[in-house]
Curated annotation (Swiss-Prot):
Residues 108-394 form the Peptidase M14 domain. This is Gamma-D-glutamyl-L-diamino acid endopeptidase 1. It catalyses: Hydrolysis of gamma-D-glutamyl bonds to the L-terminus (position 7) of meso-diaminopimelic acid (meso-A2pm) in 7-(L-Ala-gamma-D-Glu)-meso-A2pm and 7-(L-Ala-gamma-D-Glu)-7-(D-Ala)-meso-A2pm. It is required that the D-terminal amino and carboxy groups of meso-A2pm are unsubstituted. Its EC number is 3.4.19.11. It comes from the Bacteria. Belongs to the peptidase M14 family.
Length: 396
């Protein structure tokens, strides 16, 4: 929600008026010096939208404010042209409304366009969110990263490395939405206040690493006839892509990282297909390159890669993980009921590479149980299991 500065206004005043933490206001207006506000300057208030209200007989701004449980000044700020003593029946005014509901509806076939639309809605409503593409997919779809937090400890979560594990994307987007709601409404999640976590951590989210693959599983093959025929051939001449894990080039993105890639490659398929083909060499696919570049450019304390399924958490690689990894995975297990497993007896995964090159904690979390793609009817159950892990990843 946008408002215009009046004489005497300050971000401190707006924080008190709208009951929004000052840090969120500062982070929503990063290009503005709070000590040098100018009359007429536009300020963004996070966690609010405006709704239209039509004046009826006997209305006054004071009565409307009382009925909506708002300070009168909040209504005046979003209606700078209105003269309160000259309201007339049928006139339309704007009324601030605090966001207390989710903007993300994850309980549907959640493809790339839905995610991008939800990211746009969240960034509009919560302008302290930062986001930029980290690269493009094979089909030139920008792969977004979202940053939330103001702390020095950098943490990373990612989802939908594998196409038919796309339910991980709406799960992680729903957590982001709930985190935002708790911050702006100053409420708790499972008894935890989110404000301190926001100030201690910066969370990097890549909610869909493999957009082309997700769209293939959900929407079927693209219109391009040559590509469609190639994909069907790679898919064992089937037009049912529900078992497809790879990117649109038929390369498994979680077999693309230089962590004993040669060992994984030796036992995996040698040609493109729906799963397990690791490519001709490590880091040949744009989505894997984008993730590697992002990881090298940040200073992540730890990383969590969300997959499905199995209700397990893999936490080691070749005994290169630091001692704190075991302490952390025990907490993840406590809050989720998931089983910790030190080694998956596999190589070339993102988590493997992170542990190998940084000697820091990395985890692969296998959400839910069943056959991929997990049914959307399992969404609430999976989300409640995952929520404890999302939170623990911030407070540990």
């Amino acid at each position: 929600m946008d408002i215009l500065i009046r004489p005497g206004d300050s971000l401190w005043y707006f924080s008190d008026l709208f009951k929004i933490p000052l840090q969120l206001l500062l982070d929503s207006n990063r290009n503005i010096n709070p000590q040098l506000l100018q009359v007429g300057q536009r300020i963004q208030i996070p966690g609010y939208v405006t709704t239209s209200y039509t004046i009826t007989q006997g209305d006054s701004l004071w009565q409307i404010a009382q009925n909506k449980n708002l300070p009168l000044n909040a209504i005046l700020l979003v209606n700078p042209e209105i003269q309160p003593s000259r309201l007339h029946i049928g006139q339309t005014i704007q009324v601030p409304q605090r966001l207390t509901w989710r903007l993300v509806n994850g309980q549907q076939n959640y493809d790339y366009s839905m995610m991008m639309n939800d990211i746009k809605k969240l960034q509009t409503a919560y302008p302290f969110l930062q986001g930029t593409p980290i690269g493009n997919s094979v089909l030139a779809q920008p792969i977004p990263e979202i940053l939330i937090g103001n702390g020095s400890k950098r943490i990373h979560y990612k989802a939908s490395f594998h196409a038919n594990e796309w339910i991980t994307t709406p799960i992680i987007m729903t957590f982001l939405n709930d985190y935002l709601l708790a911050l702006t409404n100053q409420t708790t999640i499972r008894g935890l206040s989110m404000g301190p976590l926001y100030n201690q951590t910066t969370l990097s989210l890549v909610p869909m690493v493999n957009p082309d693959g997700v769209n293939l599983v959900i929407n079927g093959p693209p219109a391009n006839e040559a590509l469609k025929n190639k994909l069907i051939a790679w898919n064992h001449n089937s037009q049912n892509f529900s078992g497809w894990k790879a990117n649109i080039n038929g390369v498994d993105l979680n077999d693309q990282f230089p962590a004993k890639w040669e060992l994984e490659n030796a036992r995996n398929p040698q040609t493109p297909g729906p799963r397990d083909y690791g490519g001709e060499a490590p880091l040949t696919q744009p989505e894997a390159i984008a993730m590697a570049d992002l990881t090298r450019s940040r200073n992540f304390a730890w990383v969590l890669a969300f997959h499905t399924q199995g209700r397990v958490i893999y936490w080691g690689f070749e005994n290169l993980e630091p001692p704190e990894s075991q302490t952390m995975v025990e907490e993840f297990s406590r809050v989720s009921g998931y089983e910790p497993i030190q080694s998956a007896n596999s190589y070339a995964g993102y988590k493997d590479w992170f542990i190998q090159d940084w000697r820091r904690p990395g985890f692969t979390v296998e959400l839910g149980s069943g056959t991929n793609p997990l049914p959307i009817s399992e969404f609430d159950t999976i989300y409640q299991e995952a929520l404890g892990i999302f939170l623990a990843g911030l407070y540990l």
